[in-house]
């Protein structure tokens, strides 16, 4: 019995350590077990004009526009153009025609009206911008003041809203930057018309970048997730880059491609520049200020003859990490919702959760039904585990007698215990395998509920108005503690007094920790525990009836 209990404790602590290690890596800290790929992989030769070092994009303008409230003369020349659509409230800074503020007013179904999220912002305390410009000469870029096209509407009344900004002539080029917002969409079409008004041909390079500081996003305690840049290409797939690796110049990513996208990722939300498929581009990631970072692409353009105008089009995604929506926008974009090493299990679980929600219309009840379905699927394994535990509980008095009898001779005690197991046809490890098989599923569901923006603002019943926030009255954590206490009473009492005290202390320790977990996660664990208690009680009772009948 001690061997089995020790194995189960080892499994439990290994699972806890693996969860914590995954949390560490997602929160930008090094793994406890595996060195970062950037520490072991030798960087491939850089493509022309690109490198994996932090000093890579030296030809990019380093200036960041002054935050609102600055009194510098340059800042006074610019203005903020406010706009609104059905999903956004925002501002475009005429300095660079930069999207400097973007508030999501409809971040998903079932959200409360006051639960808006400001994604892009530019204040004294926080910077997060989407900007573009031209390289290769003294051409218009994000440091120049653009002029809004006169007479354009700034509030969406139809299915689209178009805002255009014109640059001054610079280096023989004029630029007209146009943002097109579509009703119900989190994808912004950004079209740049480049006109050569000079007398000589020019060959500029366009850049598109996301700039933000390392300020953490507010999330429930114990629920921190990855914040930082990400790069996706068909050749190298999804690559996350932590701010810490960028600080140490150890970032590892694809530096050139003709596909993919670059993004800034945070809990529940992301932004991404998606250039035209097939357009060659160099990718860069760098630190530009003590706490300011950028990720972007540089796209070489064709030679523009005098009098010629060319178009450069790209899409800018800025919105919630809703898997189905992301899959329809660009290949691989759904990976910004990162499940880590459990993706292969987590994605089908979310698909199933989403299907259940489609029928019941409530994410809380969807969690309950999914947990019930998982327990039903694993019932044969759980039954085997509970039967083994019940048999072990029956022979516990005899085991304790053998331990007392041979306590001075461990070898004889182990031999006697093994003989008892053989005689009673009990496998001390019989309950371990079913538990091990189920652990990856439970961990995967943990990450599904933690990562899904659909939980944000989603109510369940009565006092639970937001499954992504902690229970305001701690009712679910208390119920979880009670359910864990009941489970300890159903299990065999450990012969070791220290183990017995630990088993009694666990419900208290876990309930305190779960006070700060999102309500959706705690709901899952409560339902899982209640179903486990019901299964164990049923199986134990059936075994008792069979024994009496025999």
UniProtKB/Swiss-Prot annotation:
Q: Where is this region: Disordered?
A: 34-73
State the InterPro entries in the record.
Membr_insert_YidC, Membr_insert_YidC_N, YidC/ALB3/OXA1/COX18, YidC/Oxa/ALB_C, YidC_ALB_C, YidC_periplasmic_sf
Name the CDD domains for this protein: 5TM_YidC_Alb3, EcYidC-like_peri
Q: Which GO terms describe its biological process?
A: protein insertion into membrane; protein transport
Question: What is the recorded membrane topology of this protein?
Answer: Multi-pass membrane protein
- For this protein, what is any one GO molecular function term? membrane insertase activity
The transmembrane residues are 3-23, 363-383, 429-449, 472-492, 503-523
Asked whether the keyword Transferase is assigned, the reply is: no
List compositional bias (Low complexity) regions by residue number: 35-73
The cross-references to Gene3D superfamilies, in alphabetical order and at most eight, read:
2.70.98.90
Family statement? Belongs to the OXA1/ALB3/YidC family. Type 1 subfamily.
Q: What name does the UniProt record give this protein?
A: Membrane protein insertase YidC
Q: Which organism is it from?
A: Paraburkholderia phymatum (strain DSM 17167 / CIP 108236 / LMG 21445 / STM815)
Gene behind the chain: yidC
